């Protein structure tokens, strides 16, 4: 564990970027990714008409209005314009069965409004990356860091083995056993 912590701290952003650039073809999406905004409000909330207009727009004034509104009224609010989120993670928040079977639904329908008996769900998709496309660096960063840690761990273990062997050899502490081939 101590080795892992030391190695994790030794991984630089430059190493991550270099590994990503050199091995882009290894990083493919298993699920589509989206950037956008999600808000879930009770059906009894005031000003739902405004929310219907606001959630479709991506500008600072409207986002501020939505954030203030969500503090007072929303059960759930997620602003993810600045980070990629997997479609299954988004689908878990909204009762829309088509997302279970058609992952590209959100590429074709960038504004989604769904109601159930208690809530109204609003989802705006600003950006969409399809399955099997290259993972964005931000989304692949943790995976790359783990790969680099594992590579350094193997390198460290091999160096320790080599050092131990060399020290034992220098001190004549190595005993060789030969099998008798006559038996």
Predicted regions span which residues?
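Peptidyl-prolyl cis-trans isomerase
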Residues: 1-183
């Amino acid at each position: 564990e101590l080795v892992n912590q030391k190695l994790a701290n030794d991984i630089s952003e430059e190493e991550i970027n270099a590994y990503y650039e050199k091995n882009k073809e290894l990083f493919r999406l298993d699920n589509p990714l989206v950037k956008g905004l999600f808000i879930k409000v009770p059906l009894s909330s005031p000003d739902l008409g405004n929310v219907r207009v606001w959630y479709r727009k991506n500008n600072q004034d409207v986002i501020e209005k939505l954030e203030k509104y969500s503090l007072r009224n929303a059960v759930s609010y997620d602003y993810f314009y600045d980070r990629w989120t997997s479609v299954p993670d988004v689908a878990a928040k909204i009762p829309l069965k088509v997302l279970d079977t058609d992952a590209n639904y959100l590429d074709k329908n960038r504004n989604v409004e769904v109601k159930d008996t208690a809530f109204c769900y609003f989802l705006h998709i600003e950006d969409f990356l399809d399955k099997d496309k290259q993972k964005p660096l931000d989304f692949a960063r943790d995976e790359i860091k783990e790969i680099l840690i594992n590579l350094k761990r193997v390198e460290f273990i091999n160096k320790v083995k080599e050092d131990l062997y060399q020290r034992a050899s220098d001190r004549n502490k190595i005993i060789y056993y030969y099998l008798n081939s006559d038996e």
